[in-house]
Amino acid sequence: MNKFFDVLKGLEGKNVLIKLRNGLEVRGKAVMIDPQTMNVLLNDADLSNAGGSDSEHFGVLIIRGDQVSLIAPLS
C-alpha cells in the first residue's frame, strides 16, 4: 500500500484536527478515513471557527474529503 495511505490509516482511532476549506476547524476521534476520497468519520467531534470562540459538538460527524485542507494528529 502507498505510504500516504498508511499515514492516513495510522490516524484512525486517534484524536485529530481537521481544517476545512471554509476556515472552520474540527477536532475529534477519527473512526475511519477513506484514503481515496479523504472522507472522514469522526466521533465526539467539535466544530469551531478558526479562533475557537464559537463551538458546536457532534456525537458523530462525516466530513466530505473535498472540504478537507489539513488533517493533523492531536497529542
Predicted regions located by residue number:
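Conserved RNA-binding domains used in RNP assembly and mRNA/RNA metabolism
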Residues: M1-S75
